[in-house]
């Protein structure tokens, strides 16, 4: 019998974390799909990433990298985060490092037809800390796939947001109730790691 993932219980293993940064790109924060609420989470997101790097916790950017005129998502949202453009680059404030990993994606989920699961498996990660935009969309879909693949999901509630408070609240509630996500804040997470 083949089992895809290890059984993740604290009784058998201590947690091995990675932080997933979803779509903290120029086009999402200040560009084509500008989100004013996205600007508000930049300081806490940067604080979490800096702390994770210092503690040796992998930082993985899951970035939209669309193909202009091809990708299905562009029909709904218009051109944004086109691969190779400034809009598809991580915002400067997050200080992307050479030690960070980048997983380009063409759909909402960071797992859909990418090598994110392979990367996490090779890093021996069992728990993902979710950050970025948007709590009710790409963060939610990435969290769903993480859960389905057997990862524990933690959401840094002050390092993720959505276009509106209602969308954010819906996303947080859904992640907690449907995937059993632990909802925490950056300061608490940095003490836990």
Regions found by a protein language model. Give the residues of each.
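A short alpha/beta connector and helix-capping loop motif
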Residues: 15, 34-52, 56-65
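Active-site flanking residues adjacent to catalytic metal/cofactor-binding acidic residues
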Residues: 20-22, 63, 157
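Short active-site segment of divalent metal-dependent hydrolases/proteases
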Residues: 26, 67
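Short acidic, Gly/Ser-rich segments with clustered Asp/Glu that frequently serve as metal-coordination loops
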Residues: 27-31
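Short glycine-enriched, charge-decorated loop/helix-capping segments at active-site entrances
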Residues: 32-39, 75-81
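Glycine-rich beta-alpha junction loops
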Residues: 65-66, 160
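Metal-dependent catalytic neighborhoods of phosphoester/phosphodiester hydrolases
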Residues: 70-74
């Amino acid at each position: 019998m083949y089992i895809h993932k290890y059984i993740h219980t604290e009784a058998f293993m201590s947690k091995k974390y990675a932080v997933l940064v979803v779509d903290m790109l120029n086009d999402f924060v200040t560009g084509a799909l500008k989100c004013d609420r996205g600007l508000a989470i930049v300081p806490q997101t940067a604080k979490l990433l800096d702390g994770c790097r210092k503690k040796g916790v992998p930082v993985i950017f899951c970035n939209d990298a669309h193909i202009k005129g091809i990708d299905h998502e562009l029909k709904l949202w218009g051109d944004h985060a086109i691969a190779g453009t400034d809009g598809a680059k991580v915002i400067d404030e997050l200080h992307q490092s050479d030690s960070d990993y980048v997983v380009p994606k063409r759909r909402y989920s960071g797992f859909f037809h990418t090598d994110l699961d392979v990367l996490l498996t090779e890093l021996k990660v069992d728990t993902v800390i979710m950050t970025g935009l948007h709590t009710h969309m790409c963060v939610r879909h990435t969290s769903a796939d993480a859960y389905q693949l057997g990862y524990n999901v933690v959401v840094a509630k002050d390092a993720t947001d959505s276009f509106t408070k209602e969308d954010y609240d819906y996303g947080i509630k859904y992640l907690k109730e449907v995937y059993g996500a632990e909802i925490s804040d950056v300061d608490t997470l940095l003490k836990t790691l």
